[in-house]
Regions:
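Core catalytic DNA strand-manipulation module of type IA topoisomerases
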Residues: 2-220
Length: 220
């Protein structure tokens, strides 16, 4: 949560904790001072109350209603989101589904942080996102001049993906990573690439050189 708030709202971890503490005091979310990312079995058994309460939270009401109607939340106790052994002090922060009248007294950042907590919570009851991936390996013949080294080949590689079924991203939020945007393909373009077979020849209209820098791997 702190990472999301820092990235989206440019607030510090301390500010995030203080904000969630305010939400807790207003009965909007559960105990904030926890590092747990899972729920307890006991909480999972009563999770329908939390979801049911969010049916009155207008921005996400339709999603909460859908989850309640489908009844998928009933099996959450057996999912990866519930693990008593991974909880040391308190389970993950989730919306209580109560105190929604207190939202009117919150500032903009506090309301946004609550919205993130509610979205991340409801998203666990949606299926995984599905992507369609295409990988290309293009080989180009190199013809050298008379008297120079023999002819050869050089290869070019490209990977593309398209969001086929947003799944939980429908509610959690669609990715906005710049790298993904650069490789975004239309359905028509993806269909053309997907129809290629090994050995197919493609006419090359031009070559462009683009300078760039690779990113070092994360230390942690």
């Amino acid at each position: 949560l702190q990472n999301d708030c820092s990235r989206l709202f440019k607030i510090s971890p301390t500010d995030t904790l203080n904000t969630v503490q305010t939400l807790y005091e207003r009965k909007l979310v559960t105990y904030p001072r926890t590092d747990a990312r899972v729920l307890s079995t006991a909480v999972a058994k009563e999770i329908g109350k939390n979801i049911g309460g969010l049916q009155k939270y207008e921005p996400l009401a339709q999603y909460a209603q859908y989850i309640m109607q489908q009844g998928g939340y009933k099996g959450v106790a057996k999912s990866k989101y519930v693990n008593d052994k991974q909880i040391t002090d308190h389970y993950a922060i989730i919306p209580t589904g109560q105190g929604l009248g207190n939202l009117n007294g919150l500032n903009d950042i506090q309301r946004k942080v609550y919205d993130i907590i509610a979205r991340r919570f409801l998203s666990i009851f949606f299926p995984a996102a599905e992507y369609e991936k295409v990988s290309l390996v293009l080989t180009r013949q190199i013809h050298t001049a008379v008297g120079e080294k023999e002819d050869g080949t050089e290869s070019f590689f490209a990977n593309f993906k398209r969001l086929k079924n947003p799944g939980y991203l429908t509610i959690a939020g669609l990715p906005s990573d710049k790298k993904q945007e650069e490789q975004k393909l239309t359905d028509e373009e993806l269909a053309k690439f997907a129809s290629l077979k090994k050995g197919d020849a493609i006419p090359v209209q031009a070559f462009n050189i683009k300078e760039g820098e690779t990113s070092p791997p994360k230390r942690y």
